[in-house]
Amino acid sequence: MSDRHMSSIFPECDHLKQIYDKCFTEFFQKFITPNYRHQYAVNPCERLHDVYKRCVEERLATQRPFEIDLDEIRKEYLNTDDDKLKDRQNNQKTNSENKCSSS
């Protein structure tokens, strides 16, 4: 792995990110070889990813390095079923409130 890397959004988490990135790069190089047994593949970096992710999420809960609405990003870019359900529920609630106020 080269010395060049993308830093974490939070400097306190950078070391964890570099450890995870190194692990994933090594794993991925094996994963793409023709002889790798994909059906038995276990992600050896999952625990490292979880630790790094927790570090970032803890800081995001208290710090906002950018003016970003994470919920809006999740909705617009991930567009999960959960997001769609919340939208439907919010629309139904808004419609119900509008009907009550116009009566």
UniProtKB/Swiss-Prot annotation:
UniProt motif Cx9C motif 2: location: 45-55
Disulfide feature: 13-55, 23-45
Protein's organism: Caenorhabditis elegans
This protein's encoding gene: mdmh-35
Keyword set includes ATP-binding: no
Residue spans of biased composition, Polar residues class: 91-103
Protein family (similarity comment): Belongs to the TRIAP1/MDM35 family.
Motif, Cx9C motif 1: chain positions: 13-23
One Pfam short name: UPF0203
Name of the protein in its database record: Uncharacterized protein mdmh-35
Region (Disordered): 80-103
Signal peptide: none
Keywords tagged on the record: Disulfide bond
Residue ranges of domain CHCH in the record: 10-63
Composition bias, Basic and acidic residues: 80-90
